[in-house]
């Protein structure tokens, strides 16, 4: 069974948090933070079965704040997509494509222009461990200690795809794209790559790709 993340109304629903965990949960990036299960009391075991950790996040947009303030309890949160498919962008597509998965829809009049999964992080013994770098952190540049004389485009692998632009001493990672066996995911990869190249006025001198299948 795939583990699920939960959203809690505020920090009062958690206990024994380390200072860095509190800082991450309340940061503007608002990632999912993996916490030891004892820090999240009164949660059903089947949300993250056979695991020692559970993903937790706080509301990060007005609709989420209104929803969590109304129900005043933790809610399971997952992306609006069928397995292997990218999240849908429009309300009408959600109603059409997810009718076998959802009983009710809470819709919004603000269109989604760019897909971005929730970032996933944990506090490790030696600092922050980023498991999925996406919403809240992308497209921030990552400073590097070395300098590149070429513009490099790294297209990544076919599974769990993420691409990267390398210029001078900066790396620019895309958000998590997904498994490129799916045609819609490949379209998302192409659209995001074009957007990043436009934003950063980036033209690659070298293109790298991991061609090992199933990686």
Where are these regions (language model features)?
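Active-site-adjacent structural elements in enzyme catalytic cores
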Residues: 1-215
């Amino acid at each position: 069974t795939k583990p699920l993340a939960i959203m809690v109304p505020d920090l009062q629903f958690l206990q024994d948090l380390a200072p860095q965990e509190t800082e991450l949960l309340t940061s503007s990036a608002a990632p999912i933070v993996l916490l030891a299960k004892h820090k999240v009391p009164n949660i059903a075991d089947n949300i993250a079965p056979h695991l020692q950790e559970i993903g937790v996040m706080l509301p990060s947009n007005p609709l989420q704040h209104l929803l969590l303030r109304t129900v005043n309890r933790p809610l399971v949160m997952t992306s609006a997509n069928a397995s292997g498919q990218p999240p849908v962008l429009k309300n009408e597509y959600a109603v059409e494509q997810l009718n076998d998965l959802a009983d009710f829809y809470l819709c919004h009049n603000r269109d989604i222009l760019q897909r971005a999964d929730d970032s996933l992080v944990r506090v490790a013994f030696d600092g922050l461990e980023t498991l999925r770098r996406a919403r809240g952190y992308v497209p921030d540049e990552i400073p590097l200690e070395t300098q590149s004389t070429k513009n490099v485009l790294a297209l990544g692998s076919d599974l769990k795809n993420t691409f990267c632009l390398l210029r001078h001493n900066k790396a620019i990672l895309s958000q998590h794209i997904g498994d490129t066996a799916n045609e819609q995911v490949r379209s998302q990869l192409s659209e995001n790559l074009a957007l990043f190249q436009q934003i950063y006025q980036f033209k690659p001198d070298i293109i790298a790709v991991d061609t090992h299948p199933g990686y």
